[in-house]
Amino acid sequence: MRIFFALELMPSAMLEITTWRDRSFRGLTAGGTAHPVPPGNFHITLAFMGDVAEHKREVLCDRVSQSLDQAPIETVSLTIDELGYWQRQGILWLGPSRCPPELQQLANRLKGLGSRVGGKQDNKLFRAHITLFRRCKLPPPPPLEPPDFSLHHRDFVLLESCQGKRGVSYHTLQRWPLSA
């Protein structure tokens, strides 16, 4: 079971970002030069765990709950104001130009808890982002209107990644509140 921790986006934020993306990068999908991520798949990955057996997933969920009981993490507000392109991965993304410390703390904690139960060991630095396009062969021109979205998160989730006939979909396995 491929799992990861993430911040989900509210439907209104998904709609706003989709409208901006479609207006800003109209021609990007022509000729298969890029594949847009379905709005329902927009999220911010906090920590990718990879394939984790169900019994280990249960242990992981218990440890996350215990960790939050002992040291709660505050709700997270983000200003999504930066557009980026990772050429090697072919990913066009949106993210905050400044990552709040509580978000970095949450991502680091989840990564550490996951590694203790056999989750994927990842040495990459955390970079909060929402993937807009995959398989983007060339960097797109800058948008006419810069991104500027406000996101507020009161919880985070553990998602399962499922590959189907229509591509990838994500299913919520568990949800944890952040403290107000």
Explain the meaning of each model-derived region:
Residues 1-180:
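Histidine-dependent nucleotide/RNA phosphoesterase domain, centered on the 2H-phosphoesterase fold
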